[in-house]
Amino acid sequence: ITEAKNGDKEAFVRLIRMNKQSLYKTAWIYLRDEQDIADALQNTILSCYENIQRLREPKYFKTWLMRILINECKDILHQKNHAAELDDFAEGVHCEELNLCEWKQLLLCLDEESRKIVELYYFDEFSVKEISALLEMNSNTVSTKLSRARAKLKKVIRR
């Protein structure tokens, strides 16, 4: 990260490659359209490259990068004037008891904000602290919403 901040283009490319899967998954959660995702990713990478010197704490690079992406996604949604529905999961979701279609259906019982939190926590493996920074929420609020979402999902699964 320090190398990228000092202008090392290859170091910057390595940082983006290390985070490409999380970037794509997060963009998919918000946009669900390949062209919009490509636009958001391109704008995010460009913005990150142009502003990496402003990153104060290198340990928060991923959170900072994801915040830029989420803002880009929100801008695209605003421009298109439509709401993002999260009725699909990113690839690679595995569960012994539920298949992908069942997971998709199961998450529909949650409100949009709770779905985002669950997906970021379980599928993108963000910590509560990182999610709170990404979604600009208090970490206690994220923990509470995550706990309530788990309880609701368990209740629905038991039916």
Where in this protein do the model-derived segments appear?
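Sigma70-family region 2
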Residues: K5, R32, N43-Y60, K80-N81
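Short, charged helix-capping/linker segments at alpha-helix termini
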Residues: K5-R14, Y24-N43, L134, S139, ...
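C-terminal flanking helix
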Residues: K20, Y24, I45, D111, ...
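Structural recognition of an alpha-helix C-terminal capping motif at a helix-to-coil junction
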Residues: K25, D39-L46, E50, K59-N71
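Arg/Lys-rich amphipathic alpha helix in sigma70-family domain 2
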Residues: E50-R56, R67-L86, R148
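DNA-recognition helix of helix-turn-helix
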Residues: I70, K74, F123, K129, ...
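Internal acidic/polar
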Residues: D75, Q79-L108, S127
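A short pre-motif secondary-structure segment
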Residues: I117-Y121
